Every structure is written in structure tokens, then in C-alpha cells.
Amino acid sequence: MSKKIQAIRGMSDLLPKDSAFWLSLERTIFDLFISYGYQNIRTPIVEKTDTFCRAIGGATDIVEKEMYSWIESGGESLSLNPEGTAGCVRMMIEHNLPREGIQKVFYQGAMFRRERPQKGRYRQFHQVGLEVFGATNAKVDAELMMITHTLWQVLGLKNIVLEINTLGSSETRVAYRKILIAYFNQYKDQLDENSLKRLKTNPLRILDSKNKAMRSLINNAPKLMDYLDKESAQHFEQFKTYLDALNVTYIINTCLVRGLDYYNRTVFEWTTTNLGAQGTICAGGRYDGLVEKMGGIPTPAVGLAIGLERLILLLEVQNLMAIEPTLSIYLVALGEKAQIKSMQIASTLHDALPNVILYNDLTLGSFKSQLKKANKIKAYFALILGEQELNNNQVSIKPLKGQGTQQTMDLEEAIKYLKENK
């Protein structure tokens, strides 16, 4: 017997029993984004590896360890998307979109990282993201928080907290980097192996360490907030003022630095304690220098990404997985003539009831077996087309959820009945 083919570990299939909720959730998210004036974009899942090296930073864990990369026959290195912002920025530059004024866009798609699979962390995962190009003030940062806060309310989520921080300007971080190196050099014997490496490459990432043994050392480290340039300090104060006006509760986390090199000023995470170590549901920040760094005109920008798998895990934990029921009908056809007629009726019903799910039987089975399938898929009504119905140019409607008794009527009356009983 041949060995059964299986999916790659950490890359899961989405089965029909789960996809209805995914579609419903994505529709809710996209409708909300569109209502705030964001437009959808689609970028390739593969980019030149250099795109990510320049954007994310060569010393980050993503570039060093986690990307799926390969060399093309011509010698060029390509990579699967590990995140969405770099490809979005590349697209903006390539099509000269920043020259057209403020751009508000959203994207969705699969991302790929070579990680150790565990609950809430996968090798293929899905994100939806918002990006705004061309606006430098804190108002747009606050708008992103307002949108996500509204989304949590629409979904009914509880126990989700907004953590914010500021990383200041690039000049501020250069000066602070030296201060941080001097501090941690005094305690090198207390640093773990990963932090010793970061001390040489990106000392700010030490602040993000999950090593509990280093927590006291990190908490006592100099705070970037104390070394902010005037403009960044004002920007952060404006950001907080907007959040207060919107009644969006937040906590300031001075150790929040994010794992990508392109961030400056505002950074944020929406977190929950319901998912253990993988508690970040949404994260992002400002990246005012990235467009220029990647070859475009100087363009301020800010964005966020929501991890769909983690969001769905949280909805599941909080028992919020129910979706609004949609009227569904199973079309039962008995006999060869009825099969042909059922196709015509199905076409008419789709036109008259566009939001109704219609299952046209494909088994050509007995009345009993077709009705059994109708009950299995939890249809609300069976629309029956047998010999008697054919001869009288009628259909029979059988309620399957106790909504009444079976009735026979012409198709026009049936459509009216179904509209009234949605």
C-alpha cells in the first residue's frame, strides 16, 4: 500500500465544516475596513529575498532563521512572505502610489515562517492588515486603534488589552542604543545566549525577552521614554489624547519594541491572557523611514496586522464561534424529468432569493435518502419535485425544523412563502 500523503507540519487544511466561520469573520472584518475608507490590495506571496532583508532587517529572527527562501536558476534569491508590510511597501513604490496623496489600504493572505509549530504559532498562517501611507500625525495612529477596538466590540471579545509605546526617532534610538549597551554590558553574566547575541546586533530586542530570569534586569534598564526627542514626545502625547477621547483604554509598556527593525515612534499590541504565550492578536506601529529606505520618496506610514488563527482561537475560547444562520433549502427531485426541471427551478430560485443557500441534490437517490441528506446539512426546508408536482406544475415545501406542515403550491407562491419565512 502506498504511503498516505499528508500536509506539511504546521500548515493546516481548512475543511468545509470550518470555512463557513472563516468566511463570515473575514466578511465582517473587510466590511468594517471598507466602511472606514480602506481599499483592498493583493500582492504576490513571493518576493525577492532582498525586499525582506532591507525592510525587516538582516539581524532579525525572521530574516536569520524563519524565512522560506530558495535560489532561482538565474541566481536570484526569492522568499515566501513572512509578513505583509514589506510587499505592500514594494507595491507602493513600484506603482508610484505615494505621489497620489494619502493611501489607505488593507490586505489579506497567507504568511510563511519556519517556526516550531504549536498552538497559536504555525508555519503557514493568515493575516489581515491595514496600512496608511502619507499621514504623519497621530490621528491616523488613533484611527487604527479605533478600527480594531470597534472590531473587538462587533465580535463580542472580552479580556483584550491595548499596550502602547513609542520608539522615538531614528536619531533617538541611536543614542539610546549606546546607553542600553552600556547598561547591559555591566550584567553580561546575567544575559542568556540569545540576549548576548542581541547585545551586539539589536540591543532593543533584549527588552522583548520572554526569559523570566531576566525580567528584573530588564525592568531596571534605562527607559527610551526618558530620552525621547521633542517631536516624538509630542506625537506620543497626541496619540494618547486621541485614545482618551475615544475611550480606548490602554497601558504603556516601555518594554514593547516589536520584532522588526523598521518601526519608529508609535508601536502597539492588542494582547490577551486567554491564549497563554501566544497572546498577541494584533500588532503594528509607525514606519516613517521604510518607503525611502526601500527606494521610494520619503513617505510617513503606519500599519497593523491581525493574526486570523489566533483571533479564531480567542473567539473559540470565549464561546463566540456562532454565525448568523442563513436560510438553506434542499431541492429534492424524483425521476429523470424532475432532475431536469430541478435545474430550471434552481436557476429561478437563485435569481429570486440571492442570499439563500440552495442545495440541488446530485445523488439521484430515493426520496428517503435525499431527505436524509437535507437533514444532515441542516437545511431549513426541503423543496420537493415529484411526479405529482410535475404534472400540476407545482412544488411541495417541507419544513425541516418544525416551522409548520408540508404545503404544495406553484413556484411563484413558493418563492413568496420562502421570502416571508427567512
UniProtKB/Swiss-Prot annotation:
Which GO BP terms apply? histidyl-tRNA aminoacylation
| E.C. number | 6.1.1.21
Tell me which UniProt keywords the record has, alphabetically. Answer: Aminoacyl-tRNA synthetase, ATP-binding, Cytoplasm, Ligase, Nucleotide-binding, Protein biosynthesis
**GO MF annotation list:** ATP binding; histidine-tRNA ligase activity
Q: What class of enzyme is it?
A: ligase
Q: Which reaction does it catalyse?
A: tRNA(His) + L-histidine + ATP = L-histidyl-tRNA(His) + AMP + diphosphate + H(+)
Q: Where in the cell is it found?
A: Cytoplasm
Q: Which GO terms describe its cellular component?
A: cytoplasm
Stored Gene3D superfamilies: Anticodon-binding domain, Bira Bifunctional Protein, Domain 2
PROSITE patterns per UniProt: AA_TRNA_LIGASE_II
InterPro entries per UniProt: aa-tRNA-synth_II (IPR006195), aa-tRNA-synth_II/BPL/LPL (IPR045864), Anticodon-bd (IPR004154), Anticodon-bd_dom_sf (IPR036621), His-tRNA-ligase (IPR015807), HisRS-like_core (IPR041715), HisRS/HisZ (IPR004516)
Q: Which HAMAP family match?
A: His_tRNA_synth
Q: What assembly does the database describe for this protein?
A: Homodimer.
Q: Which family does it belong to?
A: Belongs to the class-II aminoacyl-tRNA synthetase family.
Q: Cite the PANTHER family for this sequence.
A: HISTIDINE--TRNA LIGASE, MITOCHONDRIAL-RELATED (PTHR43707:SF1), HISTIDYL-TRNA SYNTHETASE (PTHR43707)
- Protein name according to UniProt: Histidine--tRNA ligase
Q: Give the source species.
A: Ruthia magnifica subsp. Calyptogena magnifica
Output the lineage of the source organism: Bacteria, Pseudomonadati, Pseudomonadota, Gammaproteobacteria, Candidatus Pseudothioglobaceae
Q: Which gene encodes it?
A: hisS
